Structures are given as structure tokens and as C-alpha cells.
């Protein structure tokens, strides 16, 4: 598992064009989930109740998690946050979480996330969801995000990285590089509006192809 997490650093750099810093990421892995929950309740009572958490302080990057059947997924997700935040500040929440959902699937899977695909296709068929990246860009608190928000954030990331109609624009890569250089960057939603018409229908076709 450790080898995979270390290799993920290079995978992220190669895909996104940003090099994480050499700042260490401290992982606190509890043997029992109950011990983890109690520790987080005592030390970080204001944090949301999650199976694992990434915490960035002024001096350290920390991950808290516990052993359980999906610990690998959790660590890949949180380590992605660590690598991203060591390289770039002020990443939009939807992109931060979408990339973490992308990389949590493991190496060699090109970010394919079966649970998100199923959820989005089901809600689309029921008429209970339609994509809206402008709405995602307004999200600024992870604890308010729903599972559908995570799924849609993942889909936009996967779409922008791999769909042949948009991938050559390198929008995510350009956004992150601009953030790193200048501390601020163009909005992805506005850039999409300028370059494409009816991009939501293209996104839905991308989803249906997965």
C-alpha cells in the first residue's frame, strides 16, 4: 500500500502537470475505527464524521484514518488532497474532491469510479439530476457536499481529462498551473462556456459511454 501511495505522487504530477512539494505527509493510522472516531472527537470535535480526513495546518499535512476493508481507497483519496495542497493553494473544492475521487480508485483504472457512474446514471434516468458546473463552483464547504456532488465533481474531472472533445484544452492542468504561479486562476465554468456550446449534453454522452 505504501508503495502505491508513493507512486501516486508521480501519477498525479504526470497527469496534471504540477509537481507536489517534498513536504512530508504524516499519516496517522488507527488499528480500530472506534479508536479513530474517539480521537477525532476529542482532538477535532468540529470536523465532520468521515472514515478518513486530511488536515492542513500551518506546519504540517496530516491524514487520519483507520484500518478497515476500504482503507486503501480512503488513503488514496486523502493522499491526493495532500499532494495537491502541497503543490497548489486555493484549489476549488469541486476540483479538489473530484480529483481525490478520481485517484481513490487505484492505479491502472484511469479514474473509473463504478459507484459514481451508477449513481449518476440512475439519477439522470429518474430525472433527478442534471450537470451544472457553475453550481459546483459555488460550493465552498466539504461538509455540505452530498454524495451526488462528489459524483458530479468526479465526472467533470474525468470528462475534462479524457473526453476527446475537451481533453486537448488541458483546462484542469492550466488552472492548477496558473494557481501555482499566481495564486489565482480562471474559472473552469467560464472557460467551458467560452469554448463550447451545450457542453452538458457532451458530458452526459461521456457518462453514458462509461
Across the structure, where does each feature detected by a protein language model lie?
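Solvent-exposed coil/turn segments that connect beta secondary-structure elements
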Residues: 30-34, 68, 79, 87, ...
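Acidic helix-start/capping segments at beta-turn-to-alpha-helix junctions
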Residues: 18-38, 98-104
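A short linear-motif detector with a strong N-terminal bias
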Residues: 4-8, 31-33, 41-43, 79-82
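Active-site recognition of the HExxH zinc-binding catalytic motif
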Residues: 27, 73-86, 97-101, 157
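Hydrophobic (often cysteine-bearing) scaffold residues that line and stabilize catalytic clefts
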Residues: 1-4, 72, 76, 92, ...
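Helical anchoring/docking segments at protein termini
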Residues: 2-7, 20-22, 55-67, 81
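Acidic/His/Gly-enriched intrinsically disordered linker/tail segments
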Residues: 40-66, 87-210
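Zn2+-dependent metallopeptidase catalytic core
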Residues: 1-28, 76
Amino acid at each position: 500500500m505504501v508503495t502505491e501511495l508513493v507512486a501516486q505522487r508521480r501519477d498525479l504530477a504526470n497527469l496534471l502537470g504540477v509537481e507536489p512539494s517534498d513536504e512530508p505527509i504524516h499519516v496517522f493510522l488507527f488499528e480500530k475505527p472506534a479508536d479513530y472516531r474517539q480521537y477525532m472527537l476529542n482532538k477535532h470535535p468540529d470536523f465532520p464524521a468521515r472514515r478518513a480526513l486530511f488536515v492542513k495546518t500551518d506546519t504540517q499535512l496530516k491524514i487520519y484514518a483507520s484500518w478497515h476493508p476500504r482503507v486503501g481507497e480512503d488513503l488514496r483519496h486523502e493522499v491526493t488532497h495532500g499532494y495537491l495542497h502541497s503543490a497548489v493553494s486555493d484549489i476549488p473544492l469541486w476540483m479538489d474532491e473530484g480529483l481525490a475521487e478520481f485517484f481513490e480508485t487505484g492505479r491502472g483504472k484511469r479514474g473509473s469510479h463504478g459507484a459514481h457512474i451508477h449513481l449518476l446514471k440512475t439519477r439522470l434516468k429518474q430525472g433527478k439530476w442534471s450537470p451544472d458546473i457553475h453550481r459546483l463552483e459555488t460550493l465552498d464547504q466539504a461538509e455540505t457536499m452530498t454524495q451526488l456532488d462528489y459524483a458530479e465533481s468526479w465526472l467533470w474531472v474525468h470528462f475534462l481529462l479524457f473526453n476527446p472533445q475537451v481533453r486537448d484544452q488541458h483546462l484542469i492542468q492550466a488552472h492548477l498551473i496558473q494557481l501555482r504561479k499566481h495564486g489565482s486562476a480562471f474559472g473552469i465554468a467560464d472557460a467551458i462556456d467560452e469554448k463550447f456550446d451545450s457542453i452538458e449534453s457532451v458530458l452526459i454522452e461521456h457518462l453514458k459511454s462509461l
